[in-house]
A protein has these predicted regions:
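Charge-dense polyanion-binding interfaces
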Residues: 86-119
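Short hydrophobic-aromatic micro-motifs
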Residues: 68-70, 118-119, 125
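N-terminal export signals
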Residues: 5-24
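A mature extracytoplasmic/lumenal domain signature
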Residues: 73-74, 103, 122
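Short, surface-exposed beta-strand/loop "edge" segments at domain boundaries and coil↔beta transitions
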Residues: 66, 104-108, 124-127
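N-terminal secretory signal peptides
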Residues: 27-86
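C-terminal partner/receptor-binding element of secreted or periplasmic proteins
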Residues: 124-154
């Protein structure tokens, strides 16, 4: 291949390379949050692939900055209850806990303990709780949502 063809091929492939490099980028991640690789990362509790961007959650903290990813806020609620002895740092105020806002499709993240929740949305694991940024008619806080999830069981 001569020099002229090599340069022409490189110029022709540049837009393709730029388009492909943008494919993996999805959403703006809050400071400190580890990126969730949609359709590849799995929920630490149920081992399902995290696909539905409207219900994902993430927990991060401890001395080693451990990250736990969830496909459903309900899985996170049970993880917090079941693993409290193994990871006591999860109860500390410095622990970061995010949940995807239902209308944000993985683009908007809320602090899980400050978010409001609405029931009746079909979530991946059937806990059917969705996070919203502002209180709506019939919405409730994190503690009430937690009680609903634990009462449902699984």
């Amino acid at each position: 291949m001569d020099r002229r063809r090599f340069i022409a091929a490189g110029l022709a492939l540049t837009p393709l390379a730029a388009a492909l490099s943008a494919c993996g980028k999805s959403g703006a991640w809050p400071e400190g949050m580890a990126e969730i690789k949609w359709d590849r990362d799995t929920c630490v509790r149920c081992s399902m692939v995290i696909s539905d961007r409207r219900f994902a959650a993430e927990l991060r903290g401890g001395e080693k900055n451990i990250v736990f990813k969830f496909d459903d806020i309900g899985c996170a609620v049970f993880w917090l209850r079941d693993k409290a002895k193994d990871y006591p740092w999860m109860a500390e105020p410095a622990t970061r806990f995010w949940v995807s806002e239902i209308s944000g499709s993985g683009e908007k993240w809320l602090e899980a303990r400050k978010a409001k929740y609405t029931g009746g949305k079909m979530s991946p694991m059937g806990y059917n709780q969705a996070a919203v940024a502002f209180a709506e008619a019939g919405s409730f806080d994190f503690d009430e949502m937690r009680q609903h999830v634990l009462a449902k069981g699984k």
